[in-house]
């Protein structure tokens, strides 16, 4: 059997993805999993790596790819379909006009991301339940977690981010994020190497003053002065000292 050569970048991605899966017990043998492929570099990178890990028998799972066509102007998934066909994975591209809902409900000048993501998430959860998926796989990476933590603190007054694994409020779906240790720059490099047929999000990309972009710039500026800043922020998510916070419920538990 001929050994398939993989790049240094893919090896690095494999290392951090398998580490996260092991550390947080994200995948079990025989799981029926649904990978959400948005058409962006992150989910493409995760799909390529996870498919390779299944092919070389690292994981014994049933992988299904789900893409939601939100009826945005200019959406063209022909190359995405070709890529998935060539990869040989089970997939479905489902069309729902969430774009029309967003345009109708969001006032001019406001960002679409919040409502758009809620509608997308609702369709993902529905599809997963209808098809009895054990896990929903999302492509959020280390930088997403870091930015989300700061956004929650700065704009919502909450300390929260994106956990590696969580169960939805109704208890029906388990969501996992195998790339919580992966840096975005490695996914950018991998996308260049693999030449993924990326579908840009014109809806969000046209809105320049998004909060996430501001936070990303803030982190980059801080990292320029101290390169350890991003990893320190990430490490803070697993190094919580409740006794040094102001949550009265937590303090009552600790003190009693």
UniProtKB/Swiss-Prot annotation:
According to its UniProt record, in which pathway does this protein act?
tRNA modification
> Which organism is this protein's natural source?
Francisella philomiragia subsp. philomiragia (strain ATCC 25017 / CCUG 19701 / FSC 153 / O#319-036)
Assigned protein family: Belongs to the TtcA family.
Q: How is the cofactor bound?
A: Binds 1 [4Fe-4S] cluster per subunit. The cluster is chelated by three Cys residues, the fourth Fe has a free coordination site that may bind a sulfur atom transferred from the persulfide of IscS.
Q: According to the UniProt entry, what is the EC number of this protein?
A: 2.8.1.-
Keyword Metal-binding recorded: yes
The record's listing under NCBIfam families reads:
PRK10696.1 (NF007972)
Kindly give the SUPFAM superfamilies that the UniProt entry links to this protein: Adenine nucleotide alpha hydrolases-like (SSF52402)
The extra comment attached to this record reads:
The thiolation reaction likely consists of two steps: a first activation step by ATP to form an adenylated intermediate of the target base of tRNA, and a second nucleophilic substitution step of the sulfur (S) atom supplied by the hydrosulfide attached to the Fe-S cluster.
Role of this protein: Catalyzes the ATP-dependent 2-thiolation of cytidine in position 32 of tRNA, to form 2-thiocytidine (s(2)C32). The sulfur atoms are provided by the cysteine/cysteine desulfurase (IscS) system.
- According to UniProt, the name of this protein is tRNA-cytidine(32) 2-sulfurtransferase 1
Q: Does the keyword Acetylation apply?
A: no
